[in-house]
Amino acid sequence: MAIGILTDRRDIYNEAVTHFQVGETNGRITRAIYYEFPGTNFAQLQESGRDQGHTLMCVGLLGTICQLAYCQGDDFFAYKDNLFLKACEYASAYNYAMKSDLPFMTYVWQQNNQWGGISPVTQSVMGEGGRGGTRPIMALPYYHYSKIKNLDADLT
């Protein structure tokens, strides 16, 4: 996306937009943000059961993508009823508000093994590694949602 913007190549930018919306990898927002909990303002990131370093890195990268697109007139912050905000609130609730009673949806991913095959890995609880680590990633989504959109982003 950034290369498409920098080089003024709309075809490259559009490829990134399409991948973000309907791609087949975890670069698609609805794969990176794995599950939206009904009746809450929370959505679980695909990395949540792995560890919090990867979870928060995902938040930072998604925020950058959303901001790049927003500056081009495409509002990914609002995509799927503010799905990214729900993921930020979920990650912040666990990492910064230190809530331990958050809902969790089991996630199974296909890990490559040393024999060239696939070994499924089941994540059935929130990953604790790196929990509470300070990362400079929440200012962007907080400002966008609370100051530009006037939405509640208290945990973010």
What does each model-found stretch correspond to?
Residues F76-T156:
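CBM-like carbohydrate-recognition segments
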